[in-house]
Amino acid sequence: NVTQQRDTRIDVLSVILSSFGFGGLLYGFSSVGTYGWTSATVLISLIVGAVSLFFFILRQSNLKRPMLEFGVFKFAIFSLTTFLGMLVFALLIGTETILPLYTQNVRGLSALDTGLILLPGALFMGFLSPIIGRIFDKVGGKGLALGGFTILAVTSLPFMMLSLDSSITLITVAYTLRLIGVGMIMMPLTTAGINSLPPHLIPHGTAMNNTMRQMGGSIGTAVLVSIMSSSAANAALSDPMKSAVHGMNTSFIVSGAIAVIGLVLSFFLKEKRKNKVMKQELSSSSSSS
């Protein structure tokens, strides 16, 4: 075990509040594409989630041993890497949601064909993961994040210009490169963020990072799908398929803007190696004793 093990008691109220808080927000945002922002289902879910999450945070701040330590956000590097991770997950899930709508609803391809279009990206990302890990050990996460967000921004361009007869090969290549960019960001950013925390906060940081990523994916998908739907409706073109494609193009323009924001924020990354963090904590512990 890399972290100190201790017996803890489950705080039932915290479990209930966190379930309603995170669950309500996730369900609310994920339902926007189906019901719309003004739906009672969405609004009630978001309100219940927000209120429950507020009381959950208050509860954690008053517990001696909180279930989820929000103090991890006091560390600037962790906060930044977590936010960037949310942006990446929003772009990833958003693309994986909108692209099949294009291939199946607009181009009339089967679910199998769509899966084959998406498959190379998943394979390349999995294959390159250990290689990216070795690169991270040598150069750190900042350079990888800058490169990854650059790829995400550039690969948004082909999706901004989708048409009724866009090249499927180009779409496949662009999506594959997009997932390579995601792979260059996700693991290095997560590692850099966790490395910035003292050892006793690592479990809380890991849990918080995973939770925020899911929130980012849910919120990002809701926003991108909402933009796609409203833009398609406002286009009011004679051909419904052209209106749908227009909405998708607009959604990917926003996606590209998000990637540029991530690229700019990546310049502010300042990594702290784990051995330095441990030395600082050990020295503070020895001085206090």
Identify the function of each model-found stretch.
Residues L13, L26-Y27, T38-V48, S52, ...:
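12-transmembrane solute porter fold
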Residues L269-S289:
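Intrinsic disorder in cytosolic terminal tails and internal cytosolic loops
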Residues S19, F55, M161, S287:
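Pocket-edge structural micro-motifs
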